[in-house]
Regions:
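Proteins enriched for Cys/Gly/acidic motifs involved in redox and nucleic-acid/cofactor modification
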Residues: 1-209, 248-251, 262, 283-295
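Conserved AdoMet/S-adenosylmethionine-binding subsite of the radical SAM
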Residues: 68-72, 76, 210-297
Length: 297
């Protein structure tokens, strides 16, 4: 039996500028990763096309939170191969992090890269392309996606909570945080590209922390810094928990440039069920946080 394509890499010889297409499934964090990936590939000289078009490189940014998500990821990988059987097809993200062998076994897939190693996928793709690259400008401006008005910017990734039902710690790894200066730089970059709203996203942004001298910066410090250092018209955050709703956070949410919207996940209203899930809050804490937000925001 022939070896899977992902285990027997071969260069792709081209006479034209390679085209790439990305399909992103799942969460806002994946959307942020997609934006970074798109930028890097464009700056390397590749041309972006719609995922339904013919391309030389297809990337499926996968999700694995459910069996349905796994199946959808496989469907998109097979679709990419059907559109151009000679193209490079890359499976990246959470599905490869959890079940890489399943993807290596797919004859349609050339590259398999998990979430933690996702930053290496551009180098891996470029290393597999053999093409004449004189006829492009590597400094061409990066346009934002016309169908989206918000830029997703990752400030944090990973989780160590290990709730009983959740695969995210396996898929995303241990918590890693983005330096405040880098977050500000990315927000300014989004402004320069024409975005008017930025969403600070992560696996659980409420756990954000960064050592700064003799203190530790938390999410509220980061929000304050972004609002002071940039002119972004609307700033939004995701994935906060009830115990992170304190007086300072509420004051920041009331800032005129902060979106009056928060996402707090509630898996169950039963204290027993939440305890069995190993969640880090109880129904009373959730009710108190919601009540306070309704009264003060």
């Amino acid at each position: 039996m022939d070896s899977p394509r992902s285990l027997t890499p071969q260069p792709l010889h081209l006479r034209r500028r390679p085209r790439f297409a990305i399909c992103t499934l799942g969460c806002k964090l994946n959307q942020s990763d997609e934006a970074d990936l798109r930028r890097s590939l464009r700056q390397a000289g590749l041309q972006e096309v719609d995922f339904g078009s013919e391309a030389e490189v297809y990337i499926v940014n996968t999700c694995t939170v459910t069996q349905l998500a796994d199946r959808r990821s496989r469907q998109m990988l097979r679709r990419a191969h059907r559109q151009n059987p000679e193209a490079l097809v890359a499976a990246i993200g959470c599905y490869p992090a959890v079940n890489p062998d399943e993807l290596h076994a797919m004859p349609e897939v050339d590259i398999v890269v998990g979430s933690i190693e996702k930053a290496t996928v551009v180098d891996e793709i470029l290393g597999r392309l053999d093409w004449e690259n004189q006829a492009f400008d590597s400094d061409e401006p990066v346009e934002h996606v016309e169908t989206r008005t918000r830029r997703m910017i990752k400030i944090q990734e990973g989780c160590r909570a290990h709730c009983t039902y959740c695969i995210i710690p396996r898929a995303r790894g241990a918590p890693r945080n983005v330096a405040p200066a880098e977050v500000v730089r990315r927000v300014q970059e989004a402004i320069d590209e024409g975005y008017r709203e930025v969403v600070l996203t992560g696996t659980h942004v409420g756990t954000y922390k960064w050592p700064e001298g003799d203190r530790t910066l938390r999410l509220a410090d980061l929000l304050e810094l972004v609002l002071e250092a940039t002119t972004i018209e609307r700033l939004r955050v995701t994935s906060v928990g009830p115990h992170e709703i304190d007086e300072r956070f509420i004051a920041l949410v009331n800032h005129p440039r902060m979106a009056p919207h928060l996402h707090m996940a509630l898996q169950s209203g039963s204290e027993t069920v939440l305890r069995r899930m190993k969640r880090w809050y109880n129904p009373r804490q959730f009710r108190r946080a919601v009540r306070r937000l309704r009264e003060e925001v």
